[in-house]
Amino acid sequence: MLQRLLVLRQHKERRLRQQLAHLRQAYQQREQQLADCRRERQQLCQQLQKLAQWRGNLLPAQASAQRERQHELYQAERQRQKQIGEWVALGQQQLAAIEAQQLLLRCNQREQEKLGMLINHESNRY
């Protein structure tokens, strides 16, 4: 009976480790997406800054086109900023899930140790 419980706990450990690996991989992918999004936002901010520097030196027709371009860049930058906030929130959720998974794994390992000691104790009794 105890041996069967130990085998079940070992299967559970394998499953928990696989899930933990998947969670960590998803977290790393999201971290990369966050870095990419931040880089894109930085590039958009630089483009906006360059457009703002030229603003007073343009003819009215050029200034109108520049305002449209500046508005498009601003909208894209705001979208990236929103996406960054979403990626950060998701990252916090993923970290919490990883920590919870690690806790489950540690608890399962303790249970396996207890079962192992009980099995040893039981076999030593006879």
Tell me what each language-model feature is.
Residues 1-126:
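Charge-rich amphipathic alpha-helical interaction elements
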